[in-house]
Design a protein with these regions (language model features):
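Terminal leader/tail segments of proteins
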Residues: 2-178
Length: 178
């Protein structure tokens, strides 16, 4: 099932500002980027984080990350090139360690999200949710200066697509959780 989400493009540009949503960052203070930082700006309304998230056929209620396969829900692309995140190719525990989430500078892990640790927290209008993803050098090379497109294609929800641009202001920046 595919939907035309062209009406949401304006909203996507506000939630993911093209020059202010994606960064390569240095988390080790060694002067070299080692992670990707995605900033999501809440421009919709205050959001109370629920205990469980349900979207299409996906739910965190009885979620077991060891049985989860993202490719069952959709495929991701960067500049039309597929991004492989199959559990067949990665150790799940190691992969979980590559993701951190920040809300109001407070750090959360994948396990925190799955256990409902964020439940009941308010994401205020204007708040930014930061997603930090540790990526190897080869992966970071794909995030070069210039314009890029990220897509998530699924049969469950409409294709999600957003454009972003990387330049001196968001390449190899020092990580700040705020």
């Amino acid at each position: 099932m595919s939907f035309d989400i062209s009406a949401l493009k304006v909203l996507f540009k506000k939630v993911f500002p093209p020059k202010k949503s994606i960064y390569t960052v240095d988390t080790n203070n060694d002067g070299k980027a080692d992670s990707l930082l995605i900033k999501v700006l809440n421009v919709i309304m205050p959001i109370l984080v629920p205990k469980h998230i349900e979207l299409g056929g996906f739910s965190t209620k009885n979620f077991d990350i060891n049985k989860f396969e993202l490719s069952d829900y959709g495929k991701m692309y960067l500049d039309e090139f597929p991004i492989n995140v199959s559990k067949k190719d990665y150790d799940v525990e190691k992969l979980k360690g590559h993701f951190k989430f920040y809300l109001k500078a407070e750090e959360f892990t994948v396990d925190d999200l799955l256990s409902g640790k964020l439940s009941g927290r308010m994401i205020a209008l204007g708040d930014t949710i930061s997603i930090l993803i540790k990526i190897d050098e080869e992966g970071l090379e794909k995030f070069s200066e210039g314009k890029h497109t990220f897509k998530f294609k699924s049969k469950i929800i409409p294709t999600l697509e957003f454009n972003f641009e990387l330049g001196a202001e968001n390449l190899n920046q020092k990580f700040d959780p705020k």
